């Protein structure tokens, strides 16, 4: 669907009255999941290929692009609040442009312009490649452009990219989701699952490694559903395809770390566990959403597994990788959840001993089956349960982290992970299991992207401390690339911290299929991965 809508709050002037394209700057603001971060890097790449340049830190951009999330009401409110903050500037600088894309744009469509008529471009999840052309059209025709495609026009990974990191990268293996979780709106916005061919994925990984990347994260709403038959999509999918992909990543020289997010417990198979344990560069870390420990609630959520199966997967993972860090997503206050149901969740959390959990309060989202269910719970009840769950998980996380004190860990040095690093004279990095470690680098020239070995000296629920100095330091091509300024740093809003090499401003996680996947939850999410 494509439409044009006249502006109500000022618009760009005629083409010959507008500054040259080469002078125009952009800023991309990202809300939501890792898939949105991946897509935002593509939006930035498209804009740079079209002649835009990234706005310098602390300056006003000529074009501001919002890549939105639709999973929670507070994500809606945050977007419209930020759009309102830009309205005065739009009135005084009509040549400035505002574009809104992503899941909320796909959902709200023309309603978005009714709420924020000063927006210039609205585009959806299926046509991000149209962004530069839509900006040009809005700028020259002086009318807002709304273009929402109903099917994927071009796989985002095939588009130009301006990555946030020189040392770590997202690699999408699929888009869309075939699950029907009752609380989740994402399948209706991103469509049915579409897989990339293994050859395309591995070619992208190789090209990233060739530029210095040492860590990749394979992305999908449900990565272990990967495996459509590319020869004949009507044939049964290859249920071993994801494990085969992990093993193939292990054959790429120079690729030191492989992560993935997120698997669905209903389709998690033992061949994936074997591939993780037997492939040296696949990290001993698993983020697998639980959502609830109550079988009755899981049934109402249409999650297609029960607590016993979930705990069985964890048991087999730990048997193969005793030191694996397992993290999860949990929703509190799903419609009809009783105290007995919630007690079952607490019991599973105690048994699972998660390293971290992203915990959320259920948020009623129009258009989802759960929004029509009876038994919507009072806010006070949900809040009280949420606080109990957070307290329990904080205790478990702290106990797990204290058990690592005195151990040596290998870190991929990161930038932006520790908000207090400047004050504490520390740097930060991620261990192979995804844990965040703040360490003292001393006077050595340690760079983001380098690999260091440190000994853990202290622990907190959300991070580890290593104040004993660096025991080993390996300079990498990734560190060289970072030092050479080959990375473009985006602006992120709303990203969880587990497993990410870069933590954005105002970290805030989403739920469902991933650590930043597709759930519908509200309130402050809690995790053991927040930067300190």
Curated annotation (Swiss-Prot):
It catalyses: N(6)-dimethylallyladenosine(37) in tRNA + (sulfur carrier)-SH + AH2 + 2 S-adenosyl-L-methionine = 2-methylsulfanyl-N(6)-dimethylallyladenosine(37) in tRNA + (sulfur carrier)-H + 5'-deoxyadenosine + L-methionine + A + S-adenosyl-L-homocysteine + 2 H(+). Residues 163-399 form the Radical SAM core domain. Coiled coil: none annotated. Residues 523-532 have a biased composition (Low complexity). Its cofactor is [4Fe-4S] cluster. [4Fe-4S] cluster 1 binds at residues 33, 69, 103. Keywords: 4Fe-4S, Cytoplasm, Iron, Iron-sulfur, Metal-binding, S-adenosyl-L-methionine, Transferase, tRNA processing. CDD domains: Radical_SAM. Residues 24-140 form the MTTase N-terminal domain. Its EC number is 2.8.4.3. Residues 402-470 form the TRAM domain. Gene3D superfamilies: Methylthiotransferase, N-terminal domain (3.40.50.12160), tm_1862 like domain (3.80.30.20). SUPFAM superfamilies: Radical SAM enzymes (SSF102114). [4Fe-4S] cluster 2 binds at residues 177, 181, 184. Residues 1-21, 510-532 are annotated as: Disordered. GO terms for molecular function: 4 iron, 4 sulfur cluster binding; metal ion binding; N6-isopentenyladenosine methylthiotransferase activity. InterPro entries: Elp3/MiaA/NifB-like_rSAM (IPR006638), Methylthiotransferase (IPR005839), Methylthiotransferase_CS (IPR020612), Methylthiotransferase_N (IPR013848), Methylthiotransferase_N_sf (IPR038135), MiaB_methiolase (IPR006463), rSAM (IPR007197), rSAM_horseshoe (IPR023404). Binds 2 [4Fe-4S] clusters. One cluster is coordinated with 3 cysteines and an exchangeable S-adenosyl-L-methionine. Belongs to the methylthiotransferase family. MiaB subfamily. Monomer. Catalyzes the methylthiolation of N6-(dimethylallyl)adenosine (i(6)A), leading to the formation of 2-methylthio-N6-(dimethylallyl)adenosine (ms(2)i(6)A) at position 37 in tRNAs that read codons beginning with uridine. This is tRNA-2-methylthio-N(6)-dimethylallyladenosine synthase. It comes from Mycobacterium ulcerans (strain Agy99). The lineage of its organism: Bacteria, Bacillati, Actinomycetota, Actinomycetes, Mycobacteriales.
